[in-house]
Amino acid sequence: MDPLGPAKTQWSWRCCLTALLFQLLVAVCFFSYLRVSRDDPTVYPNGSPFPDSTGTPAHSIPLILLWTWPFNKPIALPRCSEMVPGTADCNITADRKVYPQADAVIVHHREVMYNPSAQLPRSPRRQGQRWIWFNLESPSHCWHLKAMDGYFNLTMSYRSDSDIFTPYGWLEPWSGQPAHPPLNLSAKTELVAWAVSNWRPNSARVRYYQSLQAHLKVDVYGRSHKPLPQGTMMETLSRYKFYLAFENSVHPDYITEKLWRNALEAWAVPVVLGPSRSNYERFLPPDAFIHVDDFQSPKDLAQYLQELDKDHARYLSYFRWRETLQPRSCSWALDFCKACWKLQEESRYQTRSIAAWFT
């Protein structure tokens, strides 16, 4: 009989027990890592953190965090029920301290596109928290779209196929008689204006303008042209019969404040360069604007504008739609409320590929 037998047996059991405890510890650490990774979009950037989640708000009144102000410009945030009576409310804040409790996070693309890995939220993501990708720029001016894939559950943009449609403007019927006075033609003392902040000589809109101004006088306002002091834009542009609502790039539904504010609020007929005429007609009557594509050349457009300048009846026909419709411009506060209402209407939790969609 081996005198060391009992000791060997005891030692073997201790080794086995130690090995089992070690394996158990490794398993606990591994599954803990998986749990944290599942909560953290920086670990699984290409998949839904919680694919089985319903996205149901954790609070009776949903809490929405504005991770970034659009263009770093804070605004007042009135209650949604004050903006549109009878609608639901949310608690909307830009205080990042509420991130762990937020039901939704709105991220405006421009403020995170330069370094997404550092500028997107990096803390673990609460289960069911929905991220909303908010964007006001065209794809031509959006960087690192691929880096957004796998993070966001809802899209919010000027594109009509967004989950949350936030156009730059729209038309809506008058609730009663039109509240505006008839157009005062005698106040229209100038012909064509264009206000442009980003002057790129090789851009399509600048090249078209240069060809047009060879046949027609165009007053250009902006950094490199005539000054347009703050607060005087509408007063200045309202003196013109036509306004060049030329977009900086051509993409579906990309119809910006150049039309909705600069032209329509100034009661100038918009001359548009952007998406197709049929795209514009999804949002405007066909006789509410003039499209550059309707003419074979800038020279032909110049001739047409000069004809309208002399023919008051034809010129006034571009305002006939105002008898039944009125233009409205967007506000970011209303956009945030649209997100609030969408979150309460729909509990679906999905993961969108931003890069594949936003082209």
From Swiss-Prot:
Subcellular location: Golgi apparatus, Golgi stack membrane; Golgi apparatus; Secreted
Pathway(s): Protein modification; protein glycosylation
Chief localization: Golgi
Pfam families according to UniProt: Glyco_tran_10_N, Glyco_transf_10
Glycosylated residues in this chain: 91, 153, 184
Region (determines site-specific fucosylation), start-end ranges: 73-112
Protein name: 4-galactosyl-N-acetylglucosaminide 3-alpha-L-fucosyltransferase FUT6
Protein's organism: Pongo pygmaeus
Gene: FUT6
